[in-house]
Amino acid sequence: MLIVADENIPLIEEFFAGFGEIRRFPGRAIDRATVEQADVLLVRSVTQVDRQLLEGSPVRFVGTCTIGTDHLDLEHFQQAGITWSSAPGCNARGVVDYVLGSLLTLAEIEGVDLAQRCYGVVGAGEVGGRLIEVLRGLGWNVLVCDPQRQAAEGGDYVSLEQLLERCDVISLHTPLTKSGQDSTWHLLDRQRLNRLRHGTWLINAARGPVVDNRALAEVLRQREDLQAVLDVWEEEPTVDASLADLCVLATPHIAGYSLDGKQRGTAQIYQAYCRFLGQAEQVSLSALLPAPWVPQVSLNANADPAWALAMICRAVYDPRRDDADFRRSLSDDVAQQRSAFDGLRKHYPERREIDGLEVRIQGESAALSRIVRALGAREA
């Protein structure tokens, strides 16, 4: 049994060594020669897995340690009898932490009260749904656009046009689709970007091409009232440095890169592979996760709620460090810049999630307890 895996997938040996030989490669370097003898292929979003890659190979199981599947040719898998698995929700918490950290940074820059803003979440799947729960748990006003869920479930959804018209913050969490009525390719094009409310904050931690990057750069140059946070880029790992310069925060597709999320993704495809083989699971993620660097935060009950929110979130993650590292990596040399983009992701420092944090409140405070519950942390 030969298992070919992206070298950046964590815990591959711990989860898969019992099944056969493991060969690891850079994700962008996986090609036909790499998989010509492989039985199992384990990838991330940087590897396009399609007929051209797999035809003639013995691969019968493909696992991707990602939520999205736009890099997988699912039609070919069905035709070729290939079983596949993604890792739905594996990094949802990490992306939510990224968005919260971005909001705190924007609020400090502009001196605004986050509780007074209207939030628009586009896409209510694993990530968007988790973000909606947190924001509403904090008591904030949230509007949601998700045409597919609206058609299937009904409920309290708004159109994208209504959301753009009414919201001060737009956070994108859609998959990337290029066809059909609900295509998300350039969902925010020049026309829609020009319709953003005065002072809107735009956050894209979904897929780069969901926003027309060239149009966004032009609109940001024309409208100094707008603020943008980009974690994903239309041509990544190539990045338009001039667009990054226009963003308040710019990062190299690491919004969901928590240690918990990455290892959870590996665990999920391991579980799927065990089901494929009809075997019982022998390895548990809980036994492999290390203790967090900051296990607990203590607050007095008289702490200001807005300050407490920032303290809890930043005890776990602050995106400004990733922003600084990314900006230092930008270069006019395209090859150097592409290599640096992948290098930042490959050597990303350990980062944990808010729901692994314990918060001790000295005294009683309903407001602080509500914040802790909304964030998903544990109150001691």
Swiss-Prot record:
It comes from the Bacteria. One of its GO terms (cellular component) is cytosol. SUPFAM superfamilies: Formate/glycerate dehydrogenase catalytic domain-like (SSF52283), NAD(P)-binding Rossmann-fold domains (SSF51735). Substrate binds at residues 45, 66, 257. It is found in: Cytoplasm. NAD(+) binds at residues 146, 174, 231, 256. Keywords: Cytoplasm, NAD, Oxidoreductase, Pyridoxine biosynthesis. One of its GO terms (molecular function) is 4-phosphoerythronate dehydrogenase activity. Its EC number is 1.1.1.290. Pathway: Cofactor biosynthesis; pyridoxine 5'-phosphate biosynthesis; pyridoxine 5'-phosphate from D-erythrose 4-phosphate: step 2/5. HAMAP family: PdxB. Catalyzes the oxidation of erythronate-4-phosphate to 3-hydroxy-2-oxo-4-phosphonooxybutanoate. Homodimer. Belongs to the D-isomer specific 2-hydroxyacid dehydrogenase family. PdxB subfamily. This is Erythronate-4-phosphate dehydrogenase. It comes from Pseudomonas fluorescens (strain ATCC BAA-477 / NRRL B-23932 / Pf-5).
